[in-house]
């Protein structure tokens, strides 16, 4: 996973440490520098799905990503996002929540996707172009603006207004938005930007564009399909849509389970029928989702149940189980710690004694693997290791005993006696 953004300078390293050291959460930028253990899943997605979508843009696929809280779901989605950007795909990563954006409400989901659609950043440290209107603005300014007016008008009339899209209103709104951008019709641009985002727009303001409907809950799922179809029609390789059930209360009503199941079933069926062209759809959930929610909706259960999760031997399986890592628990923590040590060195221009810090890392990884049987111990390990490295840099290097490692994980840096009991000064 290397591209033009694959550089680790002090600023990026500091961002990574701040994110992971404060909350044990994956960094928004630079995820590749701390990624360990899921490379086999990423290789499958790259070869079996993204590369194939590049050559067969009418295809599409659905994957259910399963992992415990703190088990790397969001981290994995960040890795998939960066991989997709390398291939030129647009991405949208949406955090779902029962209050703000439940997946069973297609209108809120559409608005979230339209707001999160993003193109790859131009370089390290730069933000991606985010939001459907801005992605279309870039397209208009880079592709349409250089054309002669007659050629541009011909493309809008004969191409942008004609390729297959579920909603004719959506196709027209996107094409007219492009026209407004290149012709500097600011009033029309503002109106159509609001429409594309799913905002309420008076019908009287849409009439001059030949649009007679707005995006509402009843047609929001059609609008989401149309968004995908329009962007692929404009020449983008495809989209990777990722939904992260970050705060799902699994004790939801039967009515909401029915709505959630129906929406997911529709997506799976549309992917199977290639009606979401060039789309890889990932939905990340805790394991309880398959045990408690899916069985309540038999049609969804039949589509998601698989005798084996996705692997090199079964690349078409619908389930990506993040507990099926390529490394054991202790080796995984050591791998993460080694990556974080390299990031720490880059952030502070620090050259520690390799043997000492490798020994300290092994002690902390052993203690963490013993300390908790829950997957969430990874976050605690990450935060403790970053804090420990700060101590080593500021107070001088020392060896960490197994007893002191367990104390760090359970108590933190609370007693100066740890220096005497568990650290050996160098």
Q: Where does each model-flagged region fall?
A:
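P-loop NTPase motor core
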Residues: 82-169
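Short, surface-exposed basic-aromatic patches at helix termini and helix-loop junctions that form
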Residues: 79-88, 262, 273
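C-terminal alpha-helical "lid" subdomain
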Residues: 179-194, 312-316, 324-426
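A short, basic N-terminal segment
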Residues: 1-61, 398-426
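The catalytic "switch" region of P-loop NTPases
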Residues: 4-15, 195-358
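Helical mechanochemical/support elements of P-loop NTPase systems and associated helical scaffolds
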Residues: 12, 37, 41, 61, ...
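Conserved P-loop NTPase mechanochemical-coupling segment
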Residues: 150-221, 249-251
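Walker A/P-loop nucleotide-binding motif
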Residues: 57-79
